[in-house]
């Protein structure tokens, strides 16, 4: 079930606890039905923190709010994300989302926001081109900023991560490498989407930290020019 080990997963929960909110796409909700919460105690959180310099005040568990990008409002109202109390669930949908889906999600406590969509064109074969509608990341981040959010943990999956990378809407990358080789030509890439046409257009990273976590590797990097960006709004 897990590619990474317990130490890496514990560190991932630290990231959840130290951000204002975490963001996923509808694909993650439908495939995994996750709770998207921090499952560490206060003492476990303090012990697991890699950067001890931020322990200048008591650490308490912060359950991050949840942001779901869901164009058509397909999030089931029985999803486990609604099981955690005292946090907000934001669902961003397109103008084409059925009104009854918006109403159903609002009835179970979600805050639903309609945002603009952008069209991307993708070649399905050599002679067929299809239009794909994607929610505007810029519009979403603007609205989240208006709500007071300063740090968002984007957990994926591949399509969501590519949306942020392609629009340069990211400051920091934390990735984990497991110790198992799986392979496969059909394997899902960490960053999907269209990719960049040239190295010059591609975002460049500045690596700042690497750490071995019980035979896994944790790598931390910033997008070049964003090293000083404040990315942790909660502690």
Predicted regions and their residues:
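Enzymes that bind and transform nitrogen-containing heteroaromatic metabolites
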Residues: 1-235
